[in-house]
């Protein structure tokens, strides 16, 4: 999995510039040659900050096969209510079976072990990147209230 932050590391690598340790990202130069290391990341973390009715604020992870997103921004903006939303806090997709993300399989019992694993990975990614929302009680309350929801 390659993330946007990896491009600056790649460019620095090709330019022969030492990449600052305090910056996120890893050069994927060897990946381009077909030499992906075994310790290369398995999941990419992302964050969507906007709080729109059709796509509220959320964060998630994506791997080769699965994608999991938590919609913490339900009802934050535009005076809309949670009942107006198109989803209920979680989206989960099996990208192998549903590459267009048309079927939210979050409630599907056959994926519950995978979802539990991905939730743990999502928390680890947030901590690793320092994206913990410690300064937002509103987001923390949403996480606390709906993290274990089974809608």
Task: Show the residue positions of the predicted features.
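Carboxylate-dense, calcium-coordinating segments in secreted/extracellular and ER-lumen proteins
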Residues: 101-105
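Short amphipathic alpha-helical coiled-coil/interface segments
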Residues: 118-122
């Amino acid at each position: 999995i390659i993330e946007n932050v990896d491009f600056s590391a790649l460019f620095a690598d090709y330019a022969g510039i030492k990449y600052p340790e305090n910056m996120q990202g890893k050069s994927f130069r060897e990946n381009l040659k077909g030499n992906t290391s075994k310790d290369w990341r398995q999941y990419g973390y992302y964050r969507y900050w906007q709080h729109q009715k059709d796509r509220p604020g959320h964060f998630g992870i994506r791997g080769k096969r699965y994608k999991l997103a938590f919609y913490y921004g339900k009802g934050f903006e535009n005076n809309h209510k949670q009942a107006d939303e198109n989803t209920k806090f979680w989206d989960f997709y099996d990208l192998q079976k549903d590459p267009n993300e048309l079927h939210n399989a979050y409630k599907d019992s056959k994926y519950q072990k995978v979802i539990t694993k991905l939730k743990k990975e999502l928390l680890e990614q947030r901590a690793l990147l320092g994206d913990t929302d410690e300064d937002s009680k509103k987001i923390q309350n949403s996480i606390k209230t709906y993290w274990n929801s089974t809608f």
